[in-house]
Amino acid sequence: KYFKYNLIFKRPSGTSRGVLTEKETWFIVLEENGRKGIGECGILRGLSADDRLDYEEKLQWTCDNIHLGEEKLWQELIEFPSIQFGVEMAFLSLKSENPFVLFPSKFTSGEKSIPINGLVWMGDEVFMKQQIEEKIAQGFNCIKLKIGAIDFDKELQLLRFIRDNFDENKIEIRVDANGAFSENE
């Protein structure tokens, strides 16, 4: 079986293809011998490769045919990578000692962190600058900016702001321009 759960963003988040306010998520639930396995199938509308009209129909088909097993389902779901992920996760969850901890580690036990980038969502120049300052104040040493929503020169100014105000040996800059520019640009 599966059920849907919409994750509502705390703040609208700009991408090169529009503003996101929620993330549609479906959870596949497997049950066997009194144990449960849970797998997440999530898409971002307008961004995910499997954002299709027949998505939920394929999810129902998957649940109806779960007896085919993980390997066969993987082949049948090649056009639905998020459902493949959910199936793989559900089977791993079913086999795990704790269905919510698939790969026990110092990270999952809270003993160790994983350094990641501080993501700066698209928005106007003031909002993006505010996020940059917040991420650096929070200790991020890699700042990733989603670009393509505002004037390119203003985005360049934001990059210059980081370089002019923060040590380039301590702050790494990454940009995410997915879908923001055409091949000619």
List where the protein language model places each region.
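N-terminal capping/lid subdomain adjacent to the active-site entrance of alpha/beta enzymes
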Residues: 1-173, 178-180
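Catalytic cores of alpha/beta
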Residues: 182-185
